[in-house]
Curated annotation (Swiss-Prot):
Signal peptide: none annotated. Pfam families: CoaE. Catalyzes the phosphorylation of the 3'-hydroxyl group of dephosphocoenzyme A to form coenzyme A. It catalyses: 3'-dephospho-CoA + ATP = ADP + CoA + H(+). NCBIfam families: dephospho-CoA kinase (TIGR00152). GO terms for biological process: coenzyme A biosynthetic process. ATP binds at G18, S19, G20, K21, S22, A23. This is Dephospho-CoA kinase. SUPFAM superfamilies: P-loop containing nucleoside triphosphate hydrolases (SSF52540). Keywords: ATP-binding, Coenzyme A biosynthesis, Cytoplasm, Kinase, Nucleotide-binding, Transferase. The gene is coaE.
Amino acid sequence: MTTAAFTPWILGLTGGIGSGKSAAAERFVELGVHLVDADQAARWVVEPGRPALASIVERFGPGVLQGDGQLDRAALRQLIFADPAQRKWLEQLLHPLIGQEIFSYLAKAQSPYAVYVSPLLIESGQHHKTQRVLVIDAPQDLQIARTLARDNTSAEHVQAILQAQLAREDRLRHADDVVVNDGGLAALHEQIDRLHHFYLTLKGGQP
């Protein structure tokens, strides 16, 4: 089978803000698993010179650009956060392009399985394109504490993001596997390592 025709076994990885998705994703990479991050793909499609960035500037004006021509994501978020119509326009522009980038990179996987990490895996419907869904879960107070420690933001803003995201119960309902990330990094790694071995058995690979 040629590489171009190869469709990997895909694990969808998701979780709410501050749940520990990034730490879980990093562990899969350390274990040699091919990983594609939806947030990275979202950055690729709006790089300077790409058609999507030109469309965004045409709609919102040059104020959404930084001095170096890169997209000012914070400025754009402010413009669309409280405007559902503008947010929908942006999603309709970017989601198909991001999807193309994601599955192009997933198709290059050389590991027994690939991981696709996205905070909107379920909301976007892309979990239907994966073979299994892993949810990284954490208590909401811990999600808030982690986000405040990581980002220069307010508790109110984090609460607003949590309310805008898929409800925790709905996310868990779509999960095939759940990692409860309410401890330290070692505990998270232990759970990811155990699941990695399990996923290799599903694929017939060797740990």
